[in-house]
Amino acid sequence: MKFSTQKPKKTLHMVSLGCTKNLVDSEVMLGRLSDYQLTDDAQNADVIIVNTCGFIDSAKQESINTILSLHEDRKNESVLVMAGCLSERYKEELQKELPEIDVFTGVGDYDRIDELVNEKRSNFTSEVFLASETNERVITGSSYHAYVKLSEGCNQACSFCAIPSFKGKLHSRTLQSLVKEVKALVAKGYVDFSFVSQDSSSFLRDLDIKNGLELLVEEVEKIEGIKTARILYLYPSTTTLSLIDKIADSKVFVNYFDMPLQHITPSMLKIMKRGKGVEQLNELMNHMKSKPNSFVRTTFIAGHPGETEDDFEALCNYVENFKFDRANVFSYSDEEGTTAETRTDKVEQELIDERAEVLGEIISQTTQESLESEVGKTFEVYIDGESEEHEYLLSARKTIWAPSIDGEIYINDNELSEGEQIKFGQIYTVKITELVGDKLLATVIK
């Protein structure tokens, strides 16, 4: 009798917290650890990696709670790794306060994670890692959609944001590098792309090219096999009317405009160091909204130091009148090393939370109106697979929407009228029949 001499694969449990930019780095780590078997069973995993977020207080707390919870239940001989932004930002403090963790690393060693795990060694490379076409990634969560990172770092000086302090200045990839990566992903079957960075509209400005995103749109359009693409995280002062036109004229890029505004009054934009004045901002936003089938998403901060009742009221009125398709609101929190932290005109925490709640309710209403406007319409969707809600429903996403954040459409058929089975990851035309809560229901036409 022959017995197999092959050793069972070691297992890896990965938790990626925070933004989609973090997710790209997590996928690079998975690529470096491809000889491990991915598992949802954290308790018995040989290696556990948490790619942390250090953006705001709630994200920091989530990162700490997640890693301590995983430590509590893990097996003795496993390796627990803390990576990413929080680890980078507080490297000295965390290494002293969390002896439970075996390996600490920040934002510079994603492509060396296999070495650090094997050697059970912490390391903080001073240069921020930027994924390129040479990094083999394991794309997660989709068989047809991938995020592609344009750049790292940021040259803006927003009063409330500490990201440049640990991610550094803007560092763009070359256009050639991006094109190579996208072509390689298309060859693997990916057809839908979301381009991300801290400040996407500044792409290539560090290389003295001011219209980097327009060039990106032109080059991506030439790649055969791409069905749809979108750009996330535009910045007001580096977004131009010509860029909006370029996206709107594209046959590949959908009219998806994601621009965090943070506020709208002249005084608050000045305090927050947010570039363009209100008139130019309104011109940009109205230009986006004027495009056919446009989808406009943004974020706001409530309770930033210096925000008066008049400022907040003006912000609420603006959000109510503009009617964003989607928006988020964050409660202001002090971040070490920022100019906002040192201001003396702080808003009381109770009032910050109250304002965030009020603005959140307005946003919920405008989002609901956006969803209600879809009922009766016919449009194209990607069908992702079976819904988690019910085994007889399929989960779909409007092709213009970004994955995970913009909503979910339930399809109540699993085959076409000719009896042909619906294929996951494909585009179908559907008609929206009703809205139940915040979920759209649809039937497949073709």
Curated annotation (Swiss-Prot):
Name the residues that bind [4Fe-4S] cluster 2: C154, C158, C161
E.C. number: 2.8.4.4
Lineage, opening ranks: Bacteria, Pseudomonadati, Campylobacterota, Epsilonproteobacteria, Campylobacterales
Q: What is its main location?
A: cytoplasm
What HAMAP family does the database record attribute to this sequence? Answer: MTTase_RimO
Q: Name one GO biological process term.
A: tRNA modification
Stored CDD domains: Radical_SAM (cd01335)
The answer to whether keyword 4Fe-4S applies is yes
Residue ranges of the Radical SAM core domain? 140-369
Keywords for the protein's UniProt record, in alphabetical order = 4Fe-4S, Cytoplasm, Iron, Iron-sulfur, Metal-binding, S-adenosyl-L-methionine, Transferase
Q: Into which EC class is this enzyme placed?
A: transferase
- Is NADP a UniProt keyword of this protein? no
Q: Where is the protein situated, by its record's location annotation?
A: Cytoplasm
Please list the residues that bind [4Fe-4S] cluster 1: C19, C53, C85
Reaction catalysis annotation: L-aspartate(89)-[ribosomal protein uS12]-hydrogen + (sulfur carrier)-SH + AH2 + 2 S-adenosyl-L-methionine = 3-methylsulfanyl-L-aspartate(89)-[ribosomal protein uS12]-hydrogen + (sulfur carrier)-H + 5'-deoxyadenosine + L-methionine + A + S-adenosyl-L-homocysteine + 2 H(+)
Write down the required cofactor(s).
[4Fe-4S] cluster
What is the name of this protein?
Answer: Ribosomal protein uS12 methylthiotransferase RimO
Domain TRAM per the UniProt entry, residue ranges? 372-446
Q: Specify the MTTase N-terminal domain's residue ranges.
A: 10-122
- What does the note accompanying the cofactor annotation read? Binds 2 [4Fe-4S] clusters. One cluster is coordinated with 3 cysteines and an exchangeable S-adenosyl-L-methionine.
InterPro entries, per database record: Elp3/MiaA/NifB-like_rSAM (IPR006638), Methylthiotransferase (IPR005839), Methylthiotransferase_CS (IPR020612), Methylthiotransferase_N (IPR013848), Methylthiotransferase_N_sf (IPR038135), NA-bd_OB-fold (IPR012340), Ribosomal_uS12_MeSTrfase_RimO (IPR005840), rSAM (IPR007197)
The record's family statement is: Belongs to the methylthiotransferase family. RimO subfamily.
Give start-end of the signal peptide: none
